């Protein structure tokens, strides 16, 4: 799970490393950071380390936006169908027609979130900056948040980092100095 540990995200991060109990008495486990030295010092040692903190600044945000754009452009990302299409498809089935309203809402929620992500992305535009090498996005209408886009972009960034780590590990394991040639038959 990726958390922006700048600004308000610090409060969320602080709470994530502590066990939580809700009003009904249900206890939720604490989770730890795998990459943040500050949290590694203060979080309990025995908790699952599934959190990844990003402290985004102007340069990193530019790289994150560029990566998201690249992955969208080259077809690396596939989205669910939008909420309206999913609702029509679901109601066209007998199973969907027999669902209670609550079941239907639960089943369509991922599609609703996809639709909201599209709306947020449509509300963003490139912002002119003095440094033309940086990608900066601004909201066209400030009433619409960009939280889902940010979560999407940070997730894509973390995927890129994991892929790069795997590639480096694979490259490191190959025999140094030995060329690996692959031959194909003509066709």
Give the positions of each predicted feature.
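Mg2+-dependent endonuclease catalytic cores in nucleic-acid-processing enzymes, primarily RNase H-like
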Residues: 1-128, 183-187
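Structured alpha-helical bundle/scaffold domains in large eukaryotic membrane-trafficking regulators
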Residues: 24, 80, 133, 163-171
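Acidic two-metal-ion nuclease catalytic site recognized across multiple nuclease folds
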Residues: 127, 145-187
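Structural motif
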Residues: 59, 140-147
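Short, solvent-exposed helix-loop connector elements
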Residues: 130-142
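Flexible domain-boundary/linker segments
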Residues: 18, 85, 138, 168-169
């Amino acid at each position: 799970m990726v958390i922006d540990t700048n600004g308000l995200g610090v409060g969320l991060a602080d709470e994530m490393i502590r066990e939580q109990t809700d009003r009904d008495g249900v206890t939720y486990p604490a989770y730890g950071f795998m990459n943040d030295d500050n949290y590694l010092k203060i979080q309990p040692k025995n908790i699952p380390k599934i959190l990844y903190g990003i402290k985004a600044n102007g340069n990193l945000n530019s790289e994150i936006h560029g990566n998201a754009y690249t992955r969208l452009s080259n077809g690396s990302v596939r989205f669910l169908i939008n909420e309206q299409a999913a609702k029509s498809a679901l109601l066209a089935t007998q199973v969907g027609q027999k669902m209670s309203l609550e079941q239907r809402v639960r089943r369509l929620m991922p599609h609703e979130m996809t639709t909201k992500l599209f709306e947020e992305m449509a509300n963003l535009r490139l912002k002119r900056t003095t440094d033309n090498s940086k990608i900066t996005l601004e909201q066209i209408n400030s009433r619409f948040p960009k939280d889902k886009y940010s979560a999407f972009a940070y997730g894509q960034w973390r995927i890129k980092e994991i892929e790069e780590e795997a590639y480096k590990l694979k490259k490191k394991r190959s025999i140094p100095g030995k060329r690996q040639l692959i031959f194909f038959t003509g066709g």
